[in-house]
A protein has these predicted regions:
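Conserved pre-motif I regulatory segment
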Residues: 43-46, 76-124
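Walker A/P-loop
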Residues: 117-140
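Conserved strand-helix element at the start of the C-terminal RecA-like helicase core
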Residues: 126-127, 146-157, 307-347, 461
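Conserved helicase ATPase core of P-loop NTP-dependent helicases/translocases
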Residues: 158, 173-186, 331, 342-343, ...
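Conserved helix/coil segment N-terminal to the catalytic DExD/H
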Residues: 180-211, 222-227, 390
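Post-DEXD/H (motif II) to motif III coupling segment of the RecA-like Helicase ATP-binding lobe
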Residues: 211, 218-283, 461
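Conserved RecA-like P-loop NTPase helicase motor core
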Residues: 244, 361-463
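Conserved interdomain linker/interface between the two RecA-like ATPase lobes of SF2 helicase motors
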Residues: 266-331
Length: 477
């Protein structure tokens, strides 16, 4: 076939077994318009019975399927692992002449070696573990004619190119950045792009790439990522990196199918124990709303509850006062720009007119985001008021001391990515605090939506072995 798919030669009966084996219910499918309109049954089928094709990355699962059933199998054109030793990797790294301050850690070298040996893998490595250096080592070692690195946000296009320059690479000469209205064609060997810029491009565009790296792969929309990855028919090297998977089998198998099997690089706890990450504590501030509000809110829809919370004057003043009272640099994350972010910004700016305050959202120019990042790295006290979508993913600010969750979320990926903003260490910081703001609007036995989301976050904090404490606060007004 090609580098995206394999074709399975089997009996019709086995093909139906395979279809059943690789069919999964998509979590939350019942809420989609397609499901409600009865245009989709809410299932994803990874094996196509008609053409007998499946993602190449799922071959290990096909082998397991055969062995469990004692079926005979043969893999034509089987590709064996490359021979690449740890010693060879270390010798190669020396030839890169990395700056003195850049010293690859053992787990980064191990991940680099694993990626080169296997050619296709999904590297599971938490936020702040130094994924950009792993990507750089892979890119430089393979040194193919055309490399495509796909990232989820515009900010990450610039940041990754800047990181490469920090490692000693001539980024301006060899790296082409693609986002927004930028030209997608270039003779430069390394192309860094958002998935949004490429998913509508024709198959011909992708045929020249030999290596594809999907950074923060879990952030891509499944359909768009599939569109891109299945057009990369000649890319024999396929490396994905992700800080976290969403816990569902569907999500994991789709990513493994497009890249390769998951390889766990290191855990957040290990990084903390080794002092590579800041000491991290979570303070959960549970705001108790008055009884009359709770009674009135008991029949709220989810959207009505969110609307009430983001427009609640007492709640917004509480959040603003908290942000203004904290020492160091604070990242305040919100969900809605006009309804919430702007209100919080105006309250804080009005109270602290001479303070370094930054307001970031989806419409903020990429250069402004980069400038903000640079300024905060050298500030002792500032506040960044940023939308979750722009600053929860990949933005690398080491000098952050506090994070405030102003908007409720139960997304495992989004919560862990947001936490990652505070985990990096710097010369002026070795600890960070997350202030998780939750809202208790329970009435009798009726639980409000956002307290259920809070329960999901608490469960996640426990699983990740973070230290957390819950503070109950009466919300006045």
């Amino acid at each position: 076939m090609n580098e995206a798919y394999v074709q399975i030669d089997c009996t019709e009966g086995v093909s139906y077994e395979l279809r059943e084996q690789f069919t999964f219910q998509v979590p939350g499918a019942q809420f989609t318009p397609q499901f409600r309109a009865k245009l989709w049954d809410g299932k994803i089928r990874l094996f196509n019975v008609r053409n007998r094709q499946i993602y190449r990355g799922l071959v290990p699962y096909i082998v397991k399927f055969c062995e469990e059933r004692k079926y005979d199998w043969e893999y034509e054109n089987e590709v064996y692992d490359e021979e690449f030793s740890l010693t060879e990797a270390e010798q190669f790294i020396k030839t890169l002449n990395l700056p003195d301050k850049i010293v690859p850690r053992d787990y980064q070298i191990d991940a680099f070696v694993h990626a080169i040996r296997t050619r296709r893998t999904l590297l599971l490595s938490p936020t702040a573990s130094g994924k950009s250096l792993i990507i750089y080592l892979i890119t430089r070692y393979l040194n193919v004619k055309r490399t495509l690195i796909i990232v989820p946000t515009i900010s990450l296009v610039s940041q990754l190119a800047t990181d490469f320059a920090d490692y000693g690479f001539e980024s301006d000469k060899y790296v082409h950045r693609i986002f927004g209205g930028q030209d997608k064609e270039s003779d430069k060997p390394v192309n860094i792009s958002t998935w949004q810029s490429l998913y509508k491009m024709p198959k011909k565009y992708f045929e020249s790439f030999d290596l594809v790296i999907g950074d923060e792969a879990h952030q891509f929309k499944a359909l768009s990522l599939t569109e891109i990855m299945t057009k990369l028919v000649n890319a024999k090297y396929r490396i994905g990196t992700t800080g976290t998977l969403d816990g569902t089998k569907t999500h994991k198998l789709v990513l493994e199918g497009l890249f390769g099997t998951v390889h766990k690089v290191v855990s957040t706890k290990e990084l903390m124990d080794q002092k590579h990450l800041a000491e991290f504590n979570i303070k959960c501030l549970l705001l108790k709303h008055n009884d009359s509000i709770c009674q009135a809110a008991k029949n709220f829809t989810y959207q009505q509850e969110i609307e009430y919370l983001v427009l609640n004057e007492a709640r917004n003043k509480f959040i603003a006062n908290l942000a203004m009272s904290l020492e160091g640099n604070t990242l305040l994350l919100y969900q809605y720009v006009e309804k919430h972010g702007k209100i919080l910004h105006d309250i804080i700016k009005d109270r602290l007119p001479d303070y370094k305050i930054f307001f970031i959202h989806g419409g903020t120019d990429v250069e402004v985001r980069e400038q903000t990042r640079s300024i905060v790295e050298n500030e002792k006290r500032s506040i960044i008021i940023a939308s979750v979508g722009t600053f929860s993913t990949g933005i690398n600010i080491r000098n952050l001391h506090n994070i405030i969750f102003a908007s409720p979320s139960k997304s495992r990926i989004r919560v862990l990515q947001s936490i990652g903003r505070g985990l990096r260490t710097s010369d002026t910081k070795d600890k960070a605090v997350l202030y998780d703001i939750a809202d208790d609007m329970r009435y009798k036995k009726k639980e409000n939506y956002t307290i259920k989301h809070f329960a999901e976050r608490i469960k996640l904090y426990g699983e990740e072995r973070f230290t957390f404490k819950i503070y109950k606060i009466e919300l006045k007004g």
